[in-house]
A protein has these predicted regions:
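Conserved N-terminal catalytic core of the sugar/cofactor nucleotidyltransferase
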Residues: 1-52, 136-137
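Residue-level signal for inorganic ion chemistry
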Residues: 42, 59, 88, 122, ...
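Short beta-strand-to-loop acidic/aromatic patch adjacent to the donor-nucleotide binding site
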Residues: 50-61
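Conserved core of the sugar-phosphate nucleotidyltransferase
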Residues: 64-158
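Short, structured interface segments
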Residues: 168-188
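A short, basic/flexible loop-to-alpha-helix module at the beginning of a structural domain
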Residues: 186-201
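Canonical Rossmann dinucleotide-binding motif of NAD(H)/NADP(H)-dependent dehydrogenases/reductases
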Residues: 198-216
Length: 216
């Protein structure tokens, strides 16, 4: 795992990884002012790798991503050079004229999906896509799959079904929703796997008890 962070938080993230003994974190990389700078930082960090490895990009603002989604992305990379995660759009999407604030079009919702992360790629694919993008003076992007779609249109992009729980933390009220979803997920894990498995590798702290543990 490589964590790409803002330069101001490099030391803090290193400290957290050390204190919590996050052994899976192999690299902590410096990001930039634009989202794609972070992607490029990760791509360049593995550029010297001899094999065409799989790279999986995930936004930290989606903390409830599941093992199933990640596993499905890895599996689909066996067939595709690029993979996205998405769920069907449930709201009607309108195209609005920003000058007049009038509806210009209402696309067929049957073909519309809400994109999520992670997004997964063969290293050779995403590296070449950004190589082409960076020589385009009009290059703009907020999405890595969008870079592949625009600059390597011959590369098909597979789609893995996402989950509603894999929501993005964008606004303050999202913190409340995510906190409740996390608690609900924790309860579900106990019901599904049993208390013993759910508590494995966890630290239990007991508060209260006037006379201490073991008092008869």
């Amino acid at each position: 795992i490589a964590i790409v962070v803002h330069p101001n938080y490099l030391e803090k993230v290193e400290e957290l990884c050390c204190i919590n003994n996050f052994k899976k974190v192999g690299r902590i990389l410096q990001g930039g002012s634009e989202r794609y700078y972070s992607s490029l930082s990760a791509i360049n960090a593995y550029a010297s790798t001899e094999n065409d490895i799989n790279l999986i990009f995930h936004d930290s603002v989606r903390p409830l991503v599941t093992k199933r989604i990640i596993s499905d992305c890895i599996t689909m990379l066996g067939k595709y050079g690029a993979v996205d995660v998405a769920i069907p759009a449930t709201d009607t999407i309108i195209k609005m004229n920003l000058n007049t604030h009038e509806i210009e079009d209402i696309p067929n919702r049957q073909f519309l999906y809400n994109g999520q992360t992670p997004q997964a790629f063969k290293l050779s694919v995403i590296r070449e896509a950004y190589k082409r993008a960076l020589v385009d003076p009009n290059f703009k992007t907020t999405d890595d799959c969008g870079v592949v779609l625009k600059y390597m249109p011959d590369i098909p992009i597979g789609v893995v079904p996402g989950e509603k729980f894999n929501m993005k933390l964008t606004h303050k009220e999202d913190l409340f929703l995510l906190d409740n979803l996390f608690q609900l997920k924790s309860v579900s894990d106990v019901s599904l796997y049993g208390q013993e498995n759910a508590l494995e590798h966890k630290v239990i702290v007991i508060f209260g008890g006037s006379y201490g543990i073991g008092h008869s």
